Amino acid sequence: FTTRIWLDCARQGRLAGRAMADQPVMPEDDIPFYNASIIYDTFYSYIGEPHGADGNVYLWQGRGGYRKVRVVEGCLAGALLLKERQGANAIRLAIGEDVSAYGDAIVRPDFPWNDLTGQDWDYLF
């Protein structure tokens, strides 16, 4: 499992390097928080801001897994995925995208996140 904290470490390294070289922060550096790891025997992904008082929260439980997706003003705000983590990289790249047309379908593990983002992100790592 190669992405445990690599994405956040790489982002922090880019930001630190630019700060040391007095270079401005680039817009692509403003990407949502992403952490994926293992707690005991459970793989998880924490993406963006899945917790908050505003917006709609969609929950899914099944096959021993849990998925929570939060949408604020029609745009994807964050997700918490336990065991059933299909689409985690695509969800990370879809943060801020308008997902209002999909309703509660976006919380299901079989939701076509790769179609929404236009690339097959699940096979990059």
Language-model segments: what does each one mean?
Residues 60-125:
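C-terminal auxiliary extensions adjacent to catalytic cores
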Residues 1-89:
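Mid-to-C-terminal Rossmann-like scaffold of FAD/NAD(P)H-dependent oxidoreductases
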